[in-house]
């Protein structure tokens, strides 16, 4: 009987997510305490945010990805580059950063806008029409962020 109890405890521990990571539904990828998924659909920033908000992972409502560190930024870039369904030439995708007045805010409401990774000269609000942020992954701006028109249609990464 004690042996069966030990086996049960071992299975429960082995089946639980690793410390610092959470279980994610099929097609979602865990990183630390969140789940991430790449979508190749082309949507405006608001359409992508709404799509992510309608996605649920482990009961949590999703948002466009919020990037709080260099390590998380590299994780998202790697996830993007290794995802099926993303065309090789499509190098930009929405992240959850949007201009609000004179400052930038994450769509999930988090206040972790301490880490930034803007490309050279960005954000520049070109023609005063660039209020949403995308990740740009080619040439000199690899891993960098760019402000873009929110009506541009890009692929996107959701996080829950």
Sequence positions of predicted segments:
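Extracellular, disulfide-bonded carbohydrate-recognition/adhesion ectodomains
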Residues: 1-160
């Amino acid at each position: 009987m004690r042996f069966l109890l030990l086996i049960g405890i071992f299975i429960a521990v082995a089946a639980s997510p690793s410390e610092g990571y959470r279980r994610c539904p099929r097609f979602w990828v865990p990183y630390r305490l969140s789940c991430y998924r790449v979508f190749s659909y082309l949507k405006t920033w608001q359409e992508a945010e709404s799509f992510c908000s309608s996605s649920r992972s482990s009961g949590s409502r999703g948002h466009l990805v919020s990037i709080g560190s260099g390590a998380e930024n590299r994780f998202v870039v790697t996830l993007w580059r290794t995802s099926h369904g993303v065309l090789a030439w499509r190098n930009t995708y929405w992240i959850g950063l949007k201009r609000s007045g004179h400052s930038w805010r994450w769509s999930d409401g988090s206040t972790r806008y301490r880490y930034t990774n803007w490309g050279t000269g960005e954000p520049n609000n070109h023609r005063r029409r660039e209020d949403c942020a995308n990740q740009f992954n080619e040439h000199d701006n690899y891993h960098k962020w760019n402000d873009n028109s929110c009506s541009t249609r890009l692929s996107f990464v959701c996080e829950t």
